[in-house]
C-alpha cells in the first residue's frame, strides 16, 4: 500500500464500522493479514476498484444450504473458518471436514416442510413467541422431523436475531402439563399398584396441599373413574391419587428410567437440563399432572416412544446407522 493515509480514508468510506486504528496497526507491520472474510462480489469489485496491488483475493470453499430455514437448528452453524459451532456442524465437525463418507440424517424433508408450515400457521393464530415439534419413530428413536420456531436462514447468519438461535425442541425446558398424566398412569402400571380398570371412587373436585388448592380443570368430570378413564378425561385429582399409590421415590425413579427428568445424550449439543426438583408430597401431587416439573420436548418424545413401543428403551438420533 503506497499511500496508507489515503487508503485508510477510502476504506473508512466503504466500511464505516471498521476499526481503522487496528487496520492502521496491521498496515504498519507490513505483514500479510486478512482484512475481511466471506466478502460479496459487490465488495470484491469495490475493493478491486481501489487499485491497490497490495489487496489480494483468496477463493475459499464454503457451504451452501439449499433448504435455508428448513433444518437450521439441526444443521447448525459454522464460524468464519468453517468450523462447526452448533448443531450437526459442531458435533460432526471432524467427520464433515476429513471423512469422505457422507453423513446421512434420519430427517425427511417433506415431513419437515409440512410440520413447519403447520406450526407457522398456529403461531399466527395464537400470536405465540415460539413453537416446536418432534416426530420420532417409536421403535428405533429415528427423528423424522425436528422443528423449532422462530428459525433462521443458515446462509444469512449475520442478520439473525439471537432469539432465533434457540432450539426450543431440544434446548428449551418447560412445564408440559397434562401430557405428564400418561407417565403417571404408566408408572402406576409399571409398579403394579393399579390396573387400567382399577376404580377410584368419590374423587373430590378440589384438594389442598400445604395450603394451596389443586382442582379439576373441568368440574363436569365424574367423581367415580377407572385409572384408564382418569387419563381419557384428563383428571387432575385422579392423577394425584394414582401418584400417591406409586409414592415419591418410585415415581421419581420411573421418570428417570424413561429419561424424562435427567439430561439425555443426543447427536447435537443443544440439549436442555430439566430443572432440579425437590420431591415431597405436594411435588408428587403436582408432578402427576405435569406442573412443578420440567423437561424438554426431546425427552417427552423419548418417554412417549418407550410407552408406545411396549417398554423398550430407545435412544433418539438424527443420524442413520
Model-predicted regions and their roles:
Residues 133, 137-178, 183-321:
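Beta-lactam-recognizing serine transpeptidase/beta-lactamase-like catalytic domain environment
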Residues 1-2, 76-81, 145-151:
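Short beta->alpha transition motifs characteristic of CBS
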Residues 17, 53-58, 124-138:
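Short N-terminal helix-loop-first-beta-strand/juxtamembrane motif that initiates sensory/input modules
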Residues 32, 46, 95-131, 139:
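Conserved, well-ordered alpha-helix/loop/beta-strand core segments that scaffold catalytic motifs
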Residues 6-13, 22-101, 105:
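Small/polar-residue-rich segments within soluble enzyme cores
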